[in-house]
Amino acid sequence: MPRPTKFRRVEFFPENNYFVPWGKPKCEMHEVVLKVEELEAMRLKDIEELNQEQCAEKMEISRQTFQNIIDSARKKVAIALTEGKAIKISGGHYTTKLCKLKCIDCGEIYEINYEQDRHLCPNCGSEKVICNKKADFCRRWCKGQNRKEQYEESKNK
């Protein structure tokens, strides 16, 4: 069974997410879809001028995965520029905020995107999970979530 795809950490979101060649009619327009993490990889490497290892660390992925992402991004941009295609920045497998959780029942430690995911252990399905890493960006959310759960439990008793 293949491993699940890790979320790629992204810090930048463009104001404009659609770029078109000048003077080309819409009916003739084809587009290339550039994923958000592909844009982030190009930004870190080409604008911030970080080395591959630093870029991979910032995105919380391996160097090989970073290289695959940036190769794909550069190819898409080159195709769009040479063939006169529009570039649409959309989709991907990314997050801005991750939280490590630990299942009390089975001991599994896993990461979630706390803005989207639910508090269910992917291993056993238990709802008895706690924050395993008190990171600055999720501390208040985790504490608030725990208080909410405690309140609901006391209400049900």
Swiss-Prot record:
Protein name: UPF0251 protein CLK_0815
InterPro entries: RNA_pol_sigma_r3/r4-like, UPF0251
Family: Belongs to the UPF0251 family.
Entry superkingdom: Bacteria
